[in-house]
Amino acid sequence: MSLQATPDDKFSFGLWTVGWQARDAFGDATRPVLDPIEAVHKLAEIGAYGVTFHDDDLVPFGADAATRDGIVAGFSKALDETGLIVPMVTTNLFTHPVFKDGGFTSNDRSVRRYAIRKVLRQMDLGAELGAKTLVLWGGREGAEYDSAKDVGAALDRYREALNLLAQYSEDQGYGLPFAIEPKPNEPRGDILLPTAGHAIAFVQELERPELFGINRETGHEQMSNLNFTQGIAQALWHKKLFHIDLNGQHGPKFDQDLVFGHGDLLNAFSLVDLLENGPDGGPAYDGPRHFDYKPSRTEDFDGVWESAKDNIRMYLLLKERAKAFRADPEVQAALAESKVDELRTPTLNPGETYADLLADRSAFEDYDADAVGAKGYGFVKLNQLAIDHLLGAR
């Protein structure tokens, strides 16, 4: 088993991950600023194929045009030297005080107009660098007090902004798909579009819903006490998984951004199994495996790069374990015993109507519910087999 990443693995990292200075609400930074050029080269060394960034991760907020052009040129040169690509870009609408009440949904109209301009500029840069997706995380879109935000009006303004972004992308020939990233809270007390379900429903109200999907993040979904793997499966079912952020999280608390698999390990295993093996034996998702984590505040730069490598190692280990799980004849027998594949058989026969079903006495009148109800499904055995493979016991 090789734990060396290749470009085919499509591992990517955000500049804000390895570049996090480890400043939090209770303490100052424990690491200095990381030059984006150095980050690109180091990520290439550990086997990443891509790097992503917010606009302000690369170019400091408020930089003049000449400074911006110089930074972008240097970054582009580093991409050329390393072969890394930019699969996704996003926009920082949460750090500067101007966004304290949001960007697209700020009560202040001038802020909303400024936010849209900021995103349009990042779309231009993303297209220039070959980005394939624009992620939209509305971290400040929300409120702490119910009386402070007209939610219906806020959703109108959200829709207005996203419709304009889609039109701009099409008119410029960018063809960028957009991925909305849900999160229930933090930094706002309550964030609009808090879960994938909210976001997918909202997308249906847009002028070009086919251009919009979601970016699901492990920690964000588990903060809502939701099952990440089930949510990813539903997003795939809707054909709305446009991007994915992988990290670790211990249940519904603050956003921990741990190394992938360093939180709910069993759910991480089932997720990799879904992404790599899918329901039919082939990959269910062909996009980047993007790590959105924060190197722990306790670590120096050596620890930063070790933790970055650990994300890759964890994914590849889980991928290998999931492959062994699926190849195990006892697992296949347990899946059959649990009737997992039978769920893919339509409940109705081809062409069958409700009249036909009502006429079928075996479906109800002659159905022995007590006998069927007495049978076990063997789900615990199946789960134990998964754990055995996860722990390397098989």
Swiss-Prot record:
One of its GO terms (biological process) is D-xylose metabolic process. Signal peptide: none annotated. The keyword Zinc-finger does not apply. It is found in: Cytoplasm. It catalyses: alpha-D-xylose = alpha-D-xylulofuranose. One of its GO terms (cellular component) is cytoplasm. Pfam families: AP_endonuc_2 (PF01261). Mg(2+) 2 binds at residues 217, 220, 255, 257. This is Xylose isomerase.
